[in-house]
């Protein structure tokens, strides 16, 4: 019996919508990363993108435990000398709530071209509305 290897052109991808309201950030992100990679499928192949498309709504209502709301700090660099910037979780939720989930999931995906391809299948929206109704996404309860 030969080992099954999925081919990129034969992979069937589904669309799912996830409501992030009240979900813990890390627990949500691990499940999203797992599904973006395709590890929940029997035909999972490490070097082939077998994952599904995921739409996350209500990113502004994601929760963190403990004092992370004020203690968790996000850092980035502007590219200029001395341009290191930071913001707490609370400030990031106020400024750009989609980025909080995107950063968490991106860190859990493989680094390199395959990981970037997987990350492109994640669509995050701050509010309750998304513009992917034509794809007829199924509701995924995490």
Swiss-Prot record:
Pfam families: Ribosomal_L13. Keywords: Ribonucleoprotein, Ribosomal protein. One of its GO terms (molecular function) is structural constituent of ribosome. GO terms for cellular component: cytosolic large ribosomal subunit. It comes from the Bacteria. GO terms for biological process: negative regulation of translation; translation. The keyword Transferase does not apply. This protein is one of the early assembly proteins of the 50S ribosomal subunit, although it is not seen to bind rRNA by itself. It is important during the early stages of 50S assembly. Belongs to the universal ribosomal protein uL13 family. NCBIfam families: rplM_bact. Part of the 50S ribosomal subunit. This is Large ribosomal subunit protein uL13. It comes from Actinobacillus pleuropneumoniae serotype 5b (strain L20). The gene is rplM.
